[in-house]
Regions:
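Short, glycine-biased loop/turn motifs at secondary-structure junctions and
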Residues: 1-183
């Protein structure tokens, strides 16, 4: 099962009573897996990693062996392979694809409804009937327009300071829209 894992800046995570160091390309094994208790934790919905590691590093992983799900967002597995490190922008794009591929599923609380803002160099994913977002310089905004629960249009824009300006709101077509200004 392909999943996503967040880490601190050193590609390490807290695990049990200590910190566990990971390396891309490596496979790790545990005897058992139970969410919030044992095993290696990851998530199916990409942006869920932000709940635990907002300013960390992110990887695509393969959850192997015994897999235990907590019924919410977490997965624990007895074996995990760290496949590839991804950027914050790639994480946002993967989240958009995940929502498009799973229209019937509830999506993460990390996804904003209708309006959102990203900090400088950050990301925001906004989904709604008329989504709009703003961001600080270097941020990337992801907008998903939906109709009857299906995504009908999408746009991603880098707040570069020239074509897309910090603090201005944009719609799914990349046009400036009126909305209260960012603080």
């Amino acid at each position: 099962m392909i999943a996503y894992k967040g880490f601190n800046k050193n590609l390490a995570c807290t695990k049990g009573k200590g910190t566990f160091q990971y390396q891309v390309g490596q496979t790790y094994k545990e005897k058992q897996a139970e969410c919030a208790s044992t095993g290696f934790h990851c998530v199916e919905e990409p942006i869920e990693v932000m709940q635990w590691y907002k300013n960390g590093r992110y990887c695509i992983v393969e959850a192997l062996g015994d897999v235990h799900e907590d019924g919410n967002e977490r997965i624990s597995c007895s074996e995990i392979k760290i496949l590839k490190e991804i950027s914050l922008e790639q994480l946002g794009a993967l989240e958009c694809e995940w929502m498009r591929s799973h229209p019937e599923r509830a999506y993460s609380k990390e996804v904003c409804r209708n309006t959102g803002e990203a900090k400088q160099e950050g990301i925001v994913v906004v989904r709604g009937k008329d989504p709009r977002a703003a961001g600080g310089l270097g941020a990337t905004i992801f907008l998903l327009k939906e109709q009857s629960g299906e995504i009908v249009a999408a746009g991603a824009y880098k707040i570069d300071g020239s074509e897309y300006l910090p603090g201005m709101y944009y719609n799914v077509e990349g046009r400036k829209v009126r909305c209260r200004k960012m603080n």
